[in-house]
Curated annotation (Swiss-Prot):
Belongs to the STXBP/unc-18/SEC1 family. Residues 476-503, 533-593 are annotated as: Disordered. This is Probable protein transport Sec1b. The keyword Coiled coil does not apply. It comes from the Eukaryota. One of its GO terms (cellular component) is secretory granule.
Amino acid sequence: MSMSGSDFGAPCDDPKIFRNICRDRILKDLLQPDKDKETKSSWKVLIMDKFTVRIMAYACKMAEITDAGISLVEDLFKRREPMPSMDAIYFLQPLKENVIMLLSDMSGRCPLYRKAYIFFSSPIPKELVSYIKNDSSVIPRIGALREMNLEFFAIDMQGFTTDHDMAFTDLYSAQHNSKKFNDTISTMATRIATTFASLKEFPCVRYRAPKGTDPMTTPKFDMVPKWLATAVWDIVSKYKSTIPEFPQKETCELLIVDRPIDQIAPVIHEWTYDAMCHDLLEMDGQKYIYEVSKAGSEPERKEALLEDHDPLWVELRHIHIADASERLYDKMNNFVSKNKAAQLHSRDGGEISTKDLQKIVQALPQYGEQVEKLTLHIEIAGKINKFIREYGLRDIGQVEQDLVFGDAAAKEVISILRSKQDMSPENKLRLLIIYAIVYPEKFEGDKGEKLMQLAKLPHDEMDAINSLRYLVGSDTKKASRPGGFSLKFDAQKKKNAARTERQDGDETWALSRFFPLIEELIEKLSKGALPLNEYPSMSEPSSTEQGSTQSAAATKPAQAQPMSRRSRRTPTWAKSRNSDDSQSSDSSVLRHGSNDFKRLGNRIFVFMIGGATRSELRTVHKLTMKLKREIVLGSSSIDDPPQFISKLKMLTAGGANDV
């Protein structure tokens, strides 16, 4: 029996994609520092600290590390056996405690390894270089001492984080710690800059301008994008003289924004497969834990990584859960129809179950891995659809999106709170947060408390609403800038819409109208239509920069977004299989599109301070196909709704909500 690639998803691997460039730097520049002199027997030991091991884990597979000549991976701070006949590669953060351990390994009469190739993840301070040079016994044993400038987590083919999970609270809290504030800005800027050092890209840096014009009255947190942009610009500008072959003119664009510009995206129910996995299932990062039934014994607990090395995941992650479910059903039926052994294990030709598929795995070991993946995703999709029904998410999602597009107001919110008595407290709060963003006047005075009582939510849940007010402030002039913050507390009372209907939206599936604000920003940036007064540049864009019409665009007055027109609701949950779906899969662009990026346009980087969302990660993949430019999303972290809401509450917990 022959199997087509489409049955299980097609693998995608293109060296020009962002994360693959990071992987290649590690495999070639770091793990094979002396490759011209090496033989097949030149095995080395790789030693890392707790941070760099995570950089490595996101960028490479263990098999790739082994293929690069690494026989053993060790923890810097764990006791290690001496291997004086082998060379060691150290990949470390430039911290004093790391350097002390390194010198302890390599100094004295009996070093642990023959020679040390030392790579630091970011620029090493001069005092640490001097500290190394002062140990005369170590110097002859150093084969290389380099700065890799690779201090970020490549969490996605087109996404990275700087590992600042608490940046939202550290930078935006009403009771922030000044030292922690400054340290966070500094380390975040350094790690962002290393992405450009790794890719040898010199960015034109733009940022969300402060709402206030008076530095004396502008809240400190409102200056965060500007301060971060300044710090990044200072670092990358120095690369022109410190990194060989680093560009002298801008080769790409970096837009720095922050979470307050779009607080709907982190709380609204997103209906794509990836987002629903992280919203509804118990996930540990990209790790999904599940149980497999075993005949005559206890269920076996297993773990699965939902990431780019799983071709089915790549195909399904950014499409609607209903579409993903249909595709999985079709793949399963297609597999069974092509295989007689599989037909024997199905139930009288009826609908095949996951248990049937497990029997097929045993009967057809040659297809074990593929069928196991298919079984896994069928189980995941089944769980998600079960939760959608049990939690009544279709009705909740409809009200959420109608609020966002101006098609619902108090009547619909009150109605669903009264009719759905079994709605979870978390979903009630998410709905009320969206309501507060679109209709802030409904939470003035004691109105918010009354809504909380109607929803039967505890008083302390108001911390989330108070934080929204705190982030926007009470100055109407501050909150009314076109294209800026969508939340307008104390603004004129009128029917609001937080989004304007898009002509290119996918109406095939219900609940597909919502899009993150960065989608509009990226499109405007790509066209050179992003106003410079709202998103200033750290420098005048060079003539070689893609979208050189920005200067002209800056002279045009910014147009306020029109109010949303009432749109036709998508009446059905399902679509016909032959209808077009513009978000069907990103695998084709990953396989074939990168040559087009190089030919048609420079990269665009967007950095979201305070945590990005799954929908924003999906957006950069979608726009990469649409704009024919590789879009890379960076952030301090990737947050799912519960994480964001917890952080939101912390901003003003205890009533510290003075602006």
